[in-house]
C-alpha cells in the first residue's frame, strides 16, 4: 500500500471517530461509525497475507451486522419521535437492540467470539488500534444512550465479559490472543461501571488505552508472538524484560502501578452505589486475568525454557538492533513511563472525579 493512501485512511479513521464524538444527530453518528469501519479495513489487511484478509473479512461482517442494528434503531427512533436528535430516550426494544449493537462493536459477552481471532490474524500495531482507538466511537455512543439502557443488563454483560476474558486467556500461548482476552476483560470492567458513573468510566478507558499501548508497542518491538519468545527476552535484553514485566503487571492491576487505578476507581464507584456483590464478582474475575499476567511476567524474568542454541540465536533478528529515535519508540517511552508511575498521577485522577 502506498504511503499516501495509508495516511488518507488513517485520517479517515480519526475523522470518523471525531464525527461520532461531536455528533448530536443519529444519522451523522451512524455515518461516523461507518467511516471508521470502512477506513480501518484496508489497514488491517496492510500486509495482504491470507490471515490478514481473513481477519479483515471477519471484522467487516461483524461490524456490518452491528451497523445494521444501529441503523434500525435510528429509523425506529425517527419514526417514533419524528426527530433525529440523540436527546430522545430509547424505548425497551430499541434499548435492547442498541445494547446488542454496542456489545458487538466493543466485544462484550456474548458477542466477543470474533475479537480474539481478528487480533490474532493482524499485526501488533493493527491489534493495538482495534483494542484502543476502535473502542472510542462505540463507547461514546454508549455514553450518549446509557441513561436509556438497562443498567442491570449492561453490568451483567460486563461481569460476564470479565469472567470470560479471564477464563479464555488461561489456556493461551499466543501473545496476541492473550492481549485480546485481556481487552475483553477490561472492557467488561468499564461497561460495568459506566452505568453508575460516566466520568469514572471515561478515566478508566483513558488509563486502559495508555497501558495497553505500552504493552503492544513492547511486544511489537521485540516480536513477542508467543510465551516461548517471552522466555528468551530477558536473556538478551534485561531492560526490555524488566519493562515488559512492569507493563504486564500494570495491565493486571497490581499496586503501585497505573493499572491499579482502573480497578480502584471502579470498585470505589460501585461500592459507593451499593453494588457490593457486583464489585466482589469483578474482583474474583480479575484474579483469573491476573494468573496469565503473572505467567507472562514469570516467563520474562524468572525462568528460561530449555532450548537449542540455534533456536536462541535465530530469534536475534536485525529488527531489534536498529538505532536512533523512532515515533514508535517515543510512544513506547511515554506510555510505559505513565503505566509504571501510576500512583504519581493518583491526585490528578482523584481531582478529575470530584
UniProtKB/Swiss-Prot annotation:
The chain crosses the membrane at residues 5-25, 26-46, 60-80, 96-116, 122-142, 149-169, 198-218, 242-262, 274-294, 330-350. It is a multi-pass membrane protein. One of its GO terms (cellular component) is mitochondrial inner membrane. It catalyses: a ubiquinone + NADH + 5 H(+)(in) = a ubiquinol + NAD(+) + 4 H(+)(out). InterPro entries: Complex_I_Subunit_2, NADH_DH_su2_C, NADH_UbQ_OxRdtase_chain2, ND/Mrp_TM. Its EC number is 7.1.1.2. One of its GO terms (molecular function) is NADH dehydrogenase (ubiquinone) activity. Its main location: mitochondrion. It is found in: Mitochondrion inner membrane. The keyword Translocase applies. GO terms for biological process: mitochondrial electron transport, NADH to ubiquinone. Keywords: Electron transport, Membrane, Mitochondrion, Mitochondrion inner membrane, NAD, Respiratory chain, Translocase, Transmembrane, Transmembrane helix, Transport, Ubiquinone. It comes from the Eukaryota. Belongs to the complex I subunit 2 family. Core subunit of the mitochondrial membrane respiratory chain NADH dehydrogenase (Complex I) that is believed to belong to the minimal assembly required for catalysis. Complex I functions in the transfer of electrons from NADH to the respiratory chain. The immediate electron acceptor for the enzyme is believed to be ubiquinone. This is NADH-ubiquinone oxidoreductase chain 2. The gene is ND2.
Amino acid at each position: 500500500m502506498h504511503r499516501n493512501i495509508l495516511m488518507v485512511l488513517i485520517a479517515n479513521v480519526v475523522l470518523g471517530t471525531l464525527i461520532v464524538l461531536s455528533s448530536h444527530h443519529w444519522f451523522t453518528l451512524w455515518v461516523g461509525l461507518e467511516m471508521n469501519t470502512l477506513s480501518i479495513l484496508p489497514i488491517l489487511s496492510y500486509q495482504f497475507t491470507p490471515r490478514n484478509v481473513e481477519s479483515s473479512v471477519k471484522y467487516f461482517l461483524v461490524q456490518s451486522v452491528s451497523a445494521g442494528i444501529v441503523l434500525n434503531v435510528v429509523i425506529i427512533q425517527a419514526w417514533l419521535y419524528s426527530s433525529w436528535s440523540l436527546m430522545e430516550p430509547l424505548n425497551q426494544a430499541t434499548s435492547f437492540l442498541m445494547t446488542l449493537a454496542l456489545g458487538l462493536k466493543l466485544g462484550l459477552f456474548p458477542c466477543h467470539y470474533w475479537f480474539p481471532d481478528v487480533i490474532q490474524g493482524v499485526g501488533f500495531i493493527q491489534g493495538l488500534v482495534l483494542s484502543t482507538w476502535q473502542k472510542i466511537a462505540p463507547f461514546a455512543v454508549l455514553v450518549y444512550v446509557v441513561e436509556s439502557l438497562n443498567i442491570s443488563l449492561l453490568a451483567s454483560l460486563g461481569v460476564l465479559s470479565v469472567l470470560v476474558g479471564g477464563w479464555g486467556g488461561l489456556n493461551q500461548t499466543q501473545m496476541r490472543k492473550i492481549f485480546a482476552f485481556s481487552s475483553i476483560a477490561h472492557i467488561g470492567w468499564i461497561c460495568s461501571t459506566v452505568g453508575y458513573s460516566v466520568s469514572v468510566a471515561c478515566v478508566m478507558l483513558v488509563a486502559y488505552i495508555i497501558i495497553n499501548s505500552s504493552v503492544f508497542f513492547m511486544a511489537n518491538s521485540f516480536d513477542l508472538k508467543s510465551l516461548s519468545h517471552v522466555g528468551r527476552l530477558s536473556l538478551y535484553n534485561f531492560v526490555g524484560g524488566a519493562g515488559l514485566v512492569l507493563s504486564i503487571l500494570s495491565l493486571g492491576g497490581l499496586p503501585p502501578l497505573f493499572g491499579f487505578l482502573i480497578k480502584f476507581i471502579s470498585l470505589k464507584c460501585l461500592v459507593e452505589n451499593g453494588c457490593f456483590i457486583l464489585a466482589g464478582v469483578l474482583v474474583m474475575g480479575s484474579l483469573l486475568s491476573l494468573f496469565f499476567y503473572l505467567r507472562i511476567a514469570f516467563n520474562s524474568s524468572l525462568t528460561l525454557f530449555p532450548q537449542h542454541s540455534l533456536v536462541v540465536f535465530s530469534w536475534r533478528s536485525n529488527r531489534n538492533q536498529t538505532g536512533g529515535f523512532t515515533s514508535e519508540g517515543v510512544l513506547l517511552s511515554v506510555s510505559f513511563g505513565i503505566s509504571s508511575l501510576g500512583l504519581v498521577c493518583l491526585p490528578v485522577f482523584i481531582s478529575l472525579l470530584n
